[in-house]
Amino acid sequence: MPDRSLWRCPTCGQTFVAVNMPHSCAVRPIEAHLGDGPELRAVYDRLVAALGGPVTENVTKSRITFQTRMRFAGIDSPRRDHLLANFVLTRPIDSPRLASVDYIPPYYYVHRVRLAREDDVDGELTAWLAESRQVGDQRHVTDPEWPKVRQPPEWVRVPRQVAAAIARGDDPSRVR
């Protein structure tokens, strides 16, 4: 059985599935992001509860990420009146609720959703987060039946270099 231990950054203590993964060591307290405003804190707390169990919260200067084995969801620095949450799946979801969907080769899709009220964290979002949490557990690595969409639909945002590689017939996961 392969070693499934996580690498721990010796500077900040954050953990990762691979050695020396790019990250920010500018670790902050959660209050540095959410401040004293009870409205966004209530939305954040409901989002964390919807993640379905204990997760590691990695709070850095520009974002907060949620992790089981790998990072599977998070929020950008809060806006004045809303949170911009994201979650990772191995398939794209087409929904008017989503602000954007970005493709990351070979088969990851980062979905972004605006959360302004506690009610925005509803059953639909909770179901997406449950699937995303399984990606965080790396079920897609061990389950051969797990769906992996390697060709992004035209409505998904694709980085220019990745789109060029796809157009040439190259492996887009080799683009750095």
Model segments located where?
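Well-ordered alpha/beta subsegment
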Residues: P2, Y107-V162
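Residues immediately within or flanking Cys/His clusters that coordinate Zn2+
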Residues: R4-L6, V19-P22
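Short cysteine-rich clusters marking metal-coordination/redox-active sites
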Residues: C9-C12
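Cys/His-rich microdomains that often coordinate metals
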Residues: F16
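A short, surface-exposed helix-loop junction/capping segment
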Residues: M21-G37
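Amphipathic alpha-helical segments
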Residues: P38-V55, L129
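Short, conserved beta-strand/beta-arch hydrophobic-aromatic motifs that form part
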Residues: D45, N58-R114
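Acidic, Ser/Thr-rich low-complexity intrinsically disordered segments
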Residues: V156-R176
